[in-house]
Structure formats: C-alpha cells, structure tokens
Amino acid sequence: MKEYNIVITGVGGQGILTAANLLGWAALRAGYKVRVGEVHGMSQRFGSVIAYVRFGEDVYGAMVPEGKADVILSFEPVEALRYINYLKKGGLVFTNARPIPPVQVSMGLASYPSMEEIRKIVEEDFGGKFLAFDAEKLAIEAGNVITTNVVLIGALTQTPGFPLSAEHVKEVIRISVPPKAVDVNMRAFELGVKAAKEMLNL
C-alpha cells in the first residue's frame, strides 16, 4: 500500500491528538512508514483541532494534502464540514453524531445544520461516503465519556478498506493508557467495533 491518509478533527478536549498518536503507533507496529502531524495552538477547550495520520510504504510529509484523505474521522459533525476539502473522491467521512454547537450558533448568529444536510454535502457536493453514530453515548456506556475517541477508533477499524487490524490498534491502546484505564478503553473499543458492524451490516 503506497499511502493511507486520515484527517482527524473535532474540538479541543475531545482527545483528537491522542487518537492520532494511537493510530500512528498502530500503523508503526503493522510495519508501515508513519507520519503524524497536528495544527498547534488550536487545542484550547472547544477550539477547532485538526490532526493528520499518514502511513504506507511511500509517505514523506506529515500534512495530508487537500483532496487526498481516505477518511475524515470527526469527533463533531460540523468539524467534518470545516475540513471537507481534505476528502478525496469516494473517501469516507465518519463522525460522532453528538454536536457541540460553535459559539456563533450559541449566540444565535448562525444555525447548526441537520445530520441530513451534512450527509448531503458530503455525498452530493464532495462525492464522499458518510457514516455517523453517537460515539459519546457508547463511551458513557463503556464507563467514561473521555473514551469517545477510542469508540470512534474501534468503529474505524471495521470500515471497508481500512488497512490496520483491530488487534494492532488494541495492542497499542493496552500499552498506552494507564493500567487502571485499560478495561474501560477495551470496552469502548469493542462497543465502537460493534456499532460499525451494525451500521455496515457486517
């Protein structure tokens, strides 16, 4: 595989950079060349955050070029649209369905699009595929809302064409999180896997 490009986005405090590092380490363990990049200075709580994970046999820069992302993994629906120009034709937008309305929406200066409007933009305007589910709800079910990022990663491992096995990713999570947090993260991962299988009829 020449290269596989992931753009991860959301708002500060959602664990985006942790997710990027977990996927990067998993790709490294799978034997790929890996580059992980992030946009600095934007990870204050509720500010927009973007990280890049690139891996394959032929990967050089850390930044994913526009129009080259195989997947946009978004922790917040509108954040997926903010960075939609990164998506390649036929790429996948996979998002947590739980919105965190931006300040402009809270102040009544803008309206928040419906999930159907977001889907339409992804599919019709950008020729992409769109999947959304409430990852936050599953993280709470697993035992801790901060594992939302792990729920999303678990789900991502089941999407068609994703090159990393669930086992590679789980291995990295086991050695990366504090020992007392391993069980809750494993539960979160498996709930994500299950949700994706149900959505994709696997």
Swiss-Prot record:
Catalyzes the ferredoxin-dependent oxidative decarboxylation of arylpyruvates. Heterodimer of the IorA and IorB subunits. Keywords: Oxidoreductase. The lineage of its organism: Archaea, Methanobacteriati, Methanobacteriota, Thermococci, Thermococcales. This is Indolepyruvate oxidoreductase subunit IorB. Gene3D superfamilies: Pyruvate-ferredoxin oxidoreductase, PFOR, domain III. GO terms for molecular function: indolepyruvate ferredoxin oxidoreductase activity. The keyword Acyltransferase does not apply. Its EC number is 1.2.7.8. It catalyses: indole-3-pyruvate + 2 oxidized [2Fe-2S]-[ferredoxin] + CoA = (indol-3-yl)acetyl-CoA + 2 reduced [2Fe-2S]-[ferredoxin] + CO2 + H(+).
